[in-house]
């Protein structure tokens, strides 16, 4: 990561002074200020079907920040999933899913609050549905890894600590038009869902959540995909 980076935050409003401690604690990586290095992605995340939005632009000095790269080679796809299910709210409908959630948190989760900055892929609702299917033993870890590559997941940069917030400087904003960016986001999501449904028809002898729990599989097992960028 460069010493000084440019970040964009998609929002329905202009945010000149992001506030430490504000936001939703049930986002992907918990409480924080969610950004991306892609202006186009920020614009997609800023709009809805009914309104335009804004891509707020910032610079961030990262020189002395503790940075967690969740999609780097030191972590598996299950580390990423464990962090998601530890923070996101969702209904658990089966005993298998309940045990699976706890197993992943106990054995694969990462303490994101020990870092100033986190980089990792953003899980839109469709992608979180894939994670739920994995928890319910409906798809294998190999299928999960393949599903998470569908639709070109965007990488988000999350500012976690007060120190990191103090290094963030507002530089301006640009308008995100819903007629362009909502259409782009929806098209990518629809394509990913269609490909996912086709993938489910393929036979697989992969590793399922039940296998992981019964076998006591941990992060260092070479059968678990290391990260989403591979």
Where are the model-predicted features located?
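Extended catalytic/binding region for NAD+/ADP-ribose chemistry, centered on the ART fold
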Residues: 24-49
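Conserved NAD+-utilizing ADP-ribose enzyme module
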Residues: 2-3, 49-51, 62-230
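Compositionally biased, low-complexity linear motifs
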Residues: 44-60
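ADP-ribose/NAD+-binding catalytic cleft of ART/PARP-like enzymes
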Residues: 1-28, 56, 225-230
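Short, flexible loop/turn elements at secondary-structure junctions
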Residues: 12-13, 39, 62-64
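Residue-level preference for alpha-helix termini and adjacent loops
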Residues: 14, 19, 28, 32, ...
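Ordered hydrophobic segments in well-structured contexts
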Residues: 5-9, 33-34, 55-57, 156-158
């Amino acid at each position: 990561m460069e010493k000084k980076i440019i970040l964009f935050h998609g929002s329905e409003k202009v945010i000149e002074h992001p506030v430490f401690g504000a936001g939703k604690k049930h986002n992907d990586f918990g409480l924080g200020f969610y950004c991306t290095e892609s202006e186009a992605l920020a614009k997609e995340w800023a709009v809805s079907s009914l309104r335009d939005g804004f891509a707020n632009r910032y610079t961030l000095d990262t020189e002395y920040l503790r940075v967690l790269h969740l999609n780097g080679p030191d972590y598996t796809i299950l580390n990423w999933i464990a962090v998601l299910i530890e923070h996101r709210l969702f209904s658990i409908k089966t005993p298998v899913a309940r045990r699976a959630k706890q197993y992943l948190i106990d054995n694969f989760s990462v303490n994101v609050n020990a870092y100033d900055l986190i980089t990792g892929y953003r899980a839109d609702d469709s992608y979180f549905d894939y994670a739920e299917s994995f928890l319910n033993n409906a798809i294998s870890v190999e299928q999960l890894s393949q599903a998470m590559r569908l639709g070109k997941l965007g990488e988000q940069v999350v500012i976690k600590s007060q120190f990191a917030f103090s290094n963030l400087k507002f530089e301006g904003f640009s308008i995100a038009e819903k007629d362009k960016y909502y259409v782009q986001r929806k098209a990518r999501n629809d394509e990913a869902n269609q490909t996912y449904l086709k993938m489910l028809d393929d036979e697989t002898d992969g590793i399922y959540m039940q296998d992981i729990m019964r076998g006591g599989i941990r992060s260092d097992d070479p059968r678990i995909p290391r990260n989403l960028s591979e």
